[in-house]
Structure formats: C-alpha cells, structure tokens
Design a protein with these regions (language model features):
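Structured loop/turn residues at beta-strand edges in well-structured enzyme cores
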Residues: 35, 143, 175
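A fold-wide structural signal in alpha/beta-hydrolase
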Residues: 3-5, 123
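Core catalytic region of metal-dependent phosphoesterases/phosphodiesterases
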Residues: 2, 10, 14-114
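A structural preference for long, well-packed, hydrophobic secondary-structure segments
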Residues: 1-3, 208
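Conserved beta-sheet core of the metallophosphoesterase superfamily
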Residues: 154-155, 160-207, 212-215, 219
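Conserved catalytic scaffold of divalent metal-dependent phosphoesterases
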Residues: 83-172
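Residue-level detector of flexible, active-site-proximal loop/helix-junction positions
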Residues: 11, 82, 114-116, 131, ...
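Active-site neighborhood of phospho(di)ester-bond hydrolases with catalytic His/Asp-centered motifs
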Residues: 7-8, 39-45, 74-81, 108-113, ...
C-alpha cells in the first residue's frame, strides 16, 4: 500500500512571509522523507492572489519547493481557485508555466478531469475546476483503488468563522470512491461520517504544527 502525503492550500504570497514558508517547507520535506512517503499530492491553491501579483520571488520559491519535494517522492498536483481566473479560463494559470519550464519528470500537474493511474492498481480521479465539462467522464474503475481529487467547498462544510457553505458537491458525490483528497476549506472538520479518534501522546501533541501524519485509521 503506497504512503501518500496529502497537502493543500499553501497560498504562497507574492512577496510576504517567504522566510516563514521556507522554514515550514523544510520541516515538511523532512517529515515526508523521514516517513518515507511514496507520493506527494498537492490539492490546489498553491498561489494566493490568482493571476495578480505574480513575482520573481514567488516563481523562485515555488520552483525550489517543488524540486525539493520531487527529490523525495513524485509530486502530483491539481489547481485551486486561487491559482487561476475561473471567469476567464482562456488565461494561463499561476502554476502551469512554472511546472512546464521546470521540465521535471517527477512532477505531474493535472488540469484535465479524468482517471489517471499513478501507482499499479491506484487511480487519481480528478475533478478539475478548470475542466468541469469533463467531470461526467470521471468514474471509479472496478478492482482498483480510486481516489477522488477535488478542490472546492463541499456542502455542509464550515469556515473558520462557523459559516456553513453550500458547495457545488455534497459528500454523496464521493460515495463510490475509496478516498477523497480535498482542498479549499482550511478548517479541520468531519463531513458525513462519524468522528475518527486518533490517539497520540502528549509529547507528540507538543510537536503539532500545521499538518499531521496519520499512518492508518480503522473504523
């Protein structure tokens, strides 16, 4: 069974707080390496301000970070609403040109909706926000592990202020998939399922930062 690091909503600014990003990125890379992850999945919103304010500093930081991650494991990415202009999809997004110029064979960006095998018997089922017309062709494959990948609000999700969202999809949208890798809403919460208790020691809690690693969960 492959071990996958699921990361989303990085929101790299044009100029601000880059020192903080570098510090966290280094810690994250070390965790991925120490835990010997097989794949790294980035679930969108790499950039923060859509198509405005793209700077040389942002390009430099993203290039360094993606190269660093890809030296640990293959990196698979989708776009988020902050990475593009959803009202004008003819415009280029804030990530694709950088990935294309890097020409790194260990980095994969999925802009088209579809089913993509990334590991023997394991599929990304991509519901791309830049290719909603293609959603209808995305179906889980029999006798495979299918991971639904989507960046956007799910109905019933709540923001950090407690506001309940009416998303474009509901939890039932993912009912035929083995897993769902989601992005967009930054608040940790449970949707359409009972809460899963994860037991950790007090010492481990002291080391909690902005992400966590769950080895295995049984219900």
């Amino acid at each position: 069974m492959p071990k996958i690091a699921h990361i989303s909503d990085i929101h790299i600014r044009s100029l601000k707080r880059h020192d903080e990003y570098i510090d966290i990125f280094k810690k994250l890379s070390k965790d991925c390496a120490d835990n010997k992850v097989d794949y790294i999945f980035l679930g969108g919103d790499i950039f923060h301000t859509k198509l405005t304010g793209i700077s040389p500093e942002y390009i430099e930081l993203l290039t360094w970070w993606l190269n660093d991650l890809s030296s640990i494991a293959p990196v698979h990415m989708i776009l988020g609403n902050h990475d593009l202009n959803e009202s004008n999809l003819s415009r280029q997004d804030a990530v694709s040109p950088i990935v294309s110029a890097m020409n790194n064979s260990n980095i994969f960006l999925y802009k088209k909706s579809g089913v993509y095998e990334f590991h023997p018997g394991w599929n990304w089922c991509i519901f791309s926000i830049s290719d909603k017309e293609g959603w209808k062709s995305v179906k889980p494959m029999k006798n495979k592990i299918n991971i639904a990948c989507y960046h956007g609000p799910v109905s019933g999700a709540r923001t950090e202020t407690g506001y309940e969202l009416e998303g474009e999809v509901t939890t039932s949208f993912f009912k035929d998939y083995d897993y769902a890798f989601l992005g967009d809403i930054h608040t940790f919460q449970f949707l359409g399922t009972k809460e899963i208790e994860i037991v950790v020691s007090e010492e481990e809690l002291k080391n909690y930062s902005n992400y966590e690693i769950i080895e295995e969960v049984s219900q």
